[in-house]
């Protein structure tokens, strides 16, 4: 009976870290807009601030709470950068919504083909 040998190559932290870089808070802070990608969808304004709720972990976010609650289920109070996107959080750091990097900003794909919420920086 032949013996099957499986070799697993593990990447070092250095190699993985070089492929996904954590964006700086200062590079992402500012005015943003959220919108469901359907015709006539309301635009929700949100500001990603560079003032920490929890140092080096969660930063303040504020915006149109009614609009954000309707769109996301609850209005985010915080945010944090991730190597592959932006996480909007409540005040304790629990996830409200995750937006992955996309060609024209950041996107959150809703379940059951309900659409895609797009997060875009407001051009100043």
UniProtKB/Swiss-Prot annotation:
Gene Ontology terms, MF aspect: metalloendopeptidase inhibitor activity
Give the signal peptide range.
1-17
Q: Which pairs of Cys residues are joined through disulfide bonds in the record?
A: 44-67
Q: Which family does it belong to?
A: Belongs to the protease inhibitor I38 family.
Q: Which UniProt keywords apply?
A: Disulfide bond, Metalloenzyme inhibitor, Metalloprotease inhibitor, Periplasm, Protease inhibitor, Signal
Which SUPFAM superfamilies does UniProt cross-reference here? beta-Barrel protease inhibitors
> Which domain of life does the protein's organism represent?
Bacteria
> Any idea what this protein is called?
Alkaline proteinase inhibitor
Please provide, in alphabetical order, the Gene Ontology terms of the cellular component aspect for this entry.
Answer: periplasmic space
The task this protein performs is described as:
Inhibitor of the alkaline protease.
Q: Where does this protein come from, organism-wise?
A: Yersinia ruckeri
Q: Classify the main location.
A: periplasm
Cell compartment(s), UniProt: Periplasm
